[in-house]
Amino acid sequence: MPCYAYQGIVPVVDPTSYVHPLASLIGDVIVGPGCFIAPGASLRGDFGRIMVEGDSSIQDNVSVHANQLRDTVIRRGATIAHGSIIHGCEIGENSLIGMNAVILDNAVIGPENLVAALSLVKSDTHTPERSLVVGNPAEVVKTFDPHQVTWRNNGGGEYQKLARAALTDLIEAEPLTQADEDRQAQRVASEAIAVRLSGATAQERERKAAATNTI
């Protein structure tokens, strides 16, 4: 992975986390256990510290930057979806930041929040636990019941499994000139279901979450 010391401070990555070779870590960056850092992600700890707690997922082309006044903290089990910008703020435990969302300086996203795709969370915004945060500028539009938080990560989520698998199974290779006949059979089955707020997929996620919580 591209990893750069800055002013003598070297990034730290737990050996159980996977950082893709096309991601970059600069300076005061600390990545906890079981995390997945995807291609194109940039974590720049040149102005301040970036702390990524365990079981978090930083997806493709995410930019994470700290400012001089506070650390940027991504709490345990958080998911930062493709193309998002996380700048000088705190993302709560088990929160999901949707694709291309922007979280600005000194904002604090509460635990188990869902920030909708393309939302802009202004500086100094604080959101309560289990909030749905939507818009530009973003506002809290509802509060989820506990069983509706179907994106919660407890070490067994899809991206936590991917982090473990990628450490041994993700290998650079030359492309084939044609597809293998048994290509589909080689793929490991996944139970991942996209996060939706309504419709059949939302109902299925809630059903599975409710069943898990009653065990």
Segments and roles (model prediction):
Residues 1-34, 42, 192-215:
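Extended, small-residue-rich solenoid/repeat segments and analogous flexible loops
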Residues 1-8, 12, 46, 54, ...:
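Glycine-rich hexapeptide-repeat left-handed beta-helix
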Residues 16-18, 37, 76, 97:
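Short Cys/His-rich Zn2+-coordinating modules
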Residues 38, 59:
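Small cofactor-carrier domains centered on a conserved lysine used for covalent cofactor attachment
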